[in-house]
Structures are given as C-alpha cells and as structure tokens.
Amino acid sequence: MIRCLVPLIAEKLHGTEPTLPVVLIDLIDDLPHREEPSLVEQWQFDFWSPEHDLGGWTHFTYDQSSRKGWYVTVLVGVDRQIVLVVDPKIQIPQLTQYLEFRAEGIWAQHVCETPLEHWTVGLEAFGVTLETPEDAMGNQWGKRTGVGLDLEWEQIDKPESTDSGFSQQCSVTGEVLIDDEVIDLNAQG
C-alpha cells in the first residue's frame, strides 16, 4: 500500500487535526510540493508476503523549512526478528524529484514512475536486527545487518482519501536483501 500524507489547509492553519473536508486526490499529490516551503510531507510504502513470512514498511518524511528528512524501514515476520533501518535527522539540502538522499550508512530513493500508478523504492543500508520488539522503542541496539530493497509498487485499485492524504492498494514485486538472504517478492501492499 502506498500512503501519501498531504497537509490540508486546515492543518497548515490549525495544526494536525483537520477541520475541512478531505480534498480530491490529484496526480500532483504523489510528488513533492515545492511551492509550499512550510510543508512537512510524508510518503509510506508497505507490503506483506505470507509466503516469505515477511512484511515491510518504509516511511520517509521531508520538512521543507528545515531541509531535514526522517527515514525508517522495518522488516518483520511472525518467525523473524525485526530488522530496522532508521535515521531521524537526515540533512537534505535540496530534495530531488526522486526523493533520494544519502547519509552515513544509507542510500535511498523513492521514484514516482507514474503518479498514482507506479513507484520504485530502492534502499542500500546498514540496519540492525533487534532481539526484541521493545528494542525498537529503546536504544535500537542490535546485530549490524545489511539491508537492500529494489521494489516496485503498481496500482491495483484507485487511491482512497484519508484524513491525512490518501492510500492505495498495490502489487509489490522485486527483491529484499537481508544480509546474505535474497527474497524474490511478489506481494500485496
């Protein structure tokens, strides 16, 4: 599933609780809104594959006024330990159309191939494998783990409005790398 959180006029004026109805979804909503320097934008991508006991969630936030980003990818499963890649303070002087950034131990890009139809997400990073889920909320110490994503999200359904933007059902295909494990993914998101 793809989620794009687009602040409404009410959120800009009154905080995060919308007081106006959700606006219609436009193709431009899938892309950064460069003309609005005060926006904090978010993109989320998720998937679940019962076949591989693997779910994933990627979240990228960009604050145009501070030129900082926040990034997290989590890989989980019923019989898997949590793998976490997180950087809460990424300096991004100029956000590219590919939503790409590099920081210490991480490179990621989020390419909108066709608005509201097709996204490509790439990640090469070092994350950590956590011993317990609670470690994700604490010091996030764990075993250093190589993580890679080369995934495509393709539209199954039309996007649906939400209180904070929109979401959309997609098919998700590609590769997930966790250290030496290579997972050929064909999932829903």
What are these regions (language model features)?
Residues 1-189:
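Targeting-peptide/extracellular-domain and disordered-appendage signature
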